[in-house]
Curated annotation (Swiss-Prot):
The modification S-(dipyrrolylmethanemethyl)cysteine is found at C241. Its EC number is 2.5.1.61. It comes from Pelobacter propionicus (strain DSM 2379 / NBRC 103807 / OttBd1). This is Porphobilinogen deaminase. One of its GO terms (biological process) is protoporphyrinogen IX biosynthetic process. The gene is hemC.
C-alpha cells in the first residue's frame, strides 16, 4: 500500500526542479491518490558560487543539506543528479533507485561548428576538472575558464565573459529543452563522462519499507549496474565529485564494459583503461579497473591533486 503523501526534497535550480517534477509526475501517474509535494533546499554548492568547486573541498556539496532534512523527517525522498552523489551515505540513508540514463555525453555550446574548429588559444568555460583535463589533453592550446552557476547562467557566460565555448552535460540541456544551443556532442570515448552522468538517483530512509516499495519502479537495472560500477571505481580511488576521475559503463547482452580515466588537471598525465565482465560483477569490475588505473600512475596524479596521500 503506497503512502498517502510523499515529500520530495530537491535543490532549487531549474534543472533540479525539472528532475524532481518528473519524479513527482511519474509517482502521480502510478498512484493517482497520492499527494506529492516538493521541498526546495539550498545546499552549500548552491550558496558558494564565487569559488571553483574543487577549492570548496569536501564531498556532498549538493546533497548534504537535503540529507539532513531527510534525517530530521522533513522529507521522504530526495532526487539527485547521480554525478553529484557521494559514494558514502549518512547512517540510515541510501540510494534506492537509479533511473534510466539520459544522454551521458558532454556537449559543446559555442559559436564554432565543432570542438575541433575552435581557434588556437580559445577560451573554454567548464566547472569540471574531469572535462578540463580531457580537453587539454586533446588541445593543450586551450585556455580553460572556471565557470559556476546553473545551466542558463553558464550559457549566458559564453557572451558575458567573452568565451569561445562552454562544455555542459548533454542530459541537462535536453531536459531543459536547450538542445538548439548545442554545436556538438562529444563522443564518450573522447570525453569520458562524470561518474553517473545522465542518471538520476532517488535517496530515502532505508528503514521505511512503505516508501521504498512505492519508488522501486524507478530503478532501471542496466543503468543501475553501469552506475554502480562507475561509483565503485570512484570509491576505490577515494575520489569526490570534483576530481579529474571519469568512468562510463555500458551493458550489452549481460556484459558490462567499463572505461575509466585518471588525469592531471593540465591533461599532460593521462591514465586510461577499460575492463569487461559479467554485469552481476559490476562493483568488482569497477574496483579492479580502479586498481589498474592507480597502479599505472593514477595514484601519483591524485596525490598531486589532493596534495596529500590517498
Amino acid at each position: 500500500m503506497p503512502p498517502r503523501q510523499l515529500r520530495i526534497g530537491t535543490r532549487a535550480s531549474q534543472l533540479a526542479l525539472w528532475q524532481a517534477n518528473w519524479v513527482k509526475s511519474e509517482l502521480e501517474k502510478r498512484y493517482p491518490a497520492m499527494e506529492v509535494t516538493l521541498t526546495k533546499i539550498k545546499t552549500m554548492g548552491d550558496r558558494i558560487l564565487d569559488v571553483p568547486l574543487a577549492q570548496v573541498g569536501g564531498k556532498g556539496l549538493f546533497v548534504k543539506e537535503i540529507e539532513e532534512a531527510m534525517l530530521r523527517g522533513e522529507i521522504d525522498i530526495a532526487v539527485h543528479s547521480m554525478k553529484d552523489v557521494p559514494t558514502e551515505f549518512p547512517e540510515g540513508l541510501g540510494l534506492y533507485c537509479i533511473t534510466e540514463r539520459e544522454d551521458p555525453r558532454d556537449a559543446v555550446v559555442s559559436r564554432a561548428a565543432r570542438f575541433s574548429h575552435l581557434p588556437p588559444g580559445a577560451r573554454v568555460g567548464t566547472s569540471a576538472l574531469r572535462r578540463q583535463a580531457q580537453l587539454l589533453h586533446a588541445r593543450p592550446d586551450l585556455e580553460m575558464v572556471t565557470i559556476r552557476g546553473n545551466v542558463e547562467t553558464r550559457i549566458r557566460k559564453l557572451d558575458e565573459e567573452n568565451l569561445d565555448a562552454v562544455i555542459l552535460a548533454a542530459a541537462g540541456l535536453k531536459r531543459l529543452g536547450l538542445t538548439q544551443r548545442v554545436a556538438e556532442y562529444l563522443d564518450v570515448e573522447f570525453s569520458i563522462p562524470a561518474i553517473g552522468q545522465g542518471a538520476l538517483g532517488i535517496e530515502c530512509r532505508l528503514s521505511d519499507p512503505v516508501v521504498t516499495e512505492a519508488i522501486a519502479f524507478f530503478n532501471h537495472p542496466d543503468t543501475s549496474h553501469a552506475v554502480r560500477a562507475e561509483r565503485a571505481l570512484l570509491r576505490r580511488c577515494q575520489g569526490g565529485c570534483q576530481v579529474p576521475i571519469a568512468a562510463h559503463g555500458t551493458i550489452r547482452g549481460g556484459e558490462l564494459r567499463l572505461v575509466g580515466l585518471i588525469a592531471a588537471v593540465d591533461g599532460r598525465e593521462f591514465v586510461r583503461d577499460e575492463i569487461s565482465g559479467p554485469v552481476d560483477q559490476c562493483e568488482h569490475l569497477g574496483e579492479e579497473l580502479a586498481d589498474r588505473l592507480l597502479s599505472r600512475g593514477g595514484r601519483a596524479i591524485l596525490e598531486e591533486v589532493y596534495q596529500r596521500e590517498i
